Amino acid sequence: MPQSAAPLRQLRHRARRHFGGAGRRGLLIAFEGADGSGKTTQRKLFKTWLKADGYDVVTTKWNSSDLIKPIIKSRKTVQALSPEEFSLLHAADFRHRVEHTVLPALWDGQIVIADRFLFTGLARDVARGLDLDWVLKLYQPLLWPDLVFYFAVTPDTSSRRVTTTRTPNFYESGRDVTDIADPVESYYTFVQRVIREYESLAIVFNMTTIDGELPIADQHHRLRELFREGQTRPWSEWNVDAVAEWLAVSGNGR
């Protein structure tokens, strides 16, 4: 019988056995935060440190699927995305990367660092007026990171860091939903909504909050400490369905 036809119960058992066993396993670590929060800088420093310590590290970035990204880019260029379409396409991009990059790397015991994960979609889409439960369903079966670092900054800090060197684009500034013509003014209004959603998500999903206003070195050393503590956490039972579905669809004989 082909792997894709294996009973879901059997695939769930394989997932539990693979990720719940003894020894070093793959870890998924997400870096989240509003634009200008400093998360990308910290993600790069953290990856360099992990590799120097002997870890095999894979990085995945938001909106980077070779299959879906060109579609999103073309639709953004002509400003033809409704909030619902924006959400659906980014969820499709996310799912493609989970199936082709994230889960294969985790299965092979690598550390996956995600520069933005599903929480970016939740925060931005709800800030655009969509229902949280509706958006969550787009990302099912849900795959939860082992660690989520949320880099908290104020709307003023985010706006200052982003707009000092460039002008936010149409969707980045939220002009599709704010009805504010000035991109800088629109960005400030929109990022307030995004940060408000992030703060709620950080509580609900038990993210680890990092003060993005602190010096870069202080933040980095804090991440090291948290990683040493968090890497010993047991594998989350929540992820069984996501892994089982991937095993069924991929048919890779793992």
Predicted segments, located by residue:
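Hydrophobic residues at beta-strand termini and immediately following loops
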Residues: 60, 151, 210
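Walker A (P-loop) phosphate-binding motif
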Residues: 21-47
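NTP-dependent small-molecule kinase module
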Residues: 2-19, 47, 163-254
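ATP-dependent small-molecule kinase phosphotransfer cores
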Residues: 51-143
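A glycine- and Lys/Arg-enriched "phosphate-lid" helix/loop adjacent to the NTP-binding pocket
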Residues: 121-196
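Hydrophobic "anchor" residues on beta-strands that sit immediately upstream
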Residues: 28-31, 111, 148
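Conserved nucleotide-binding/hydrolysis micro-motifs of P-loop NTPases
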Residues: 64-66, 118-119, 153-159, 215-216
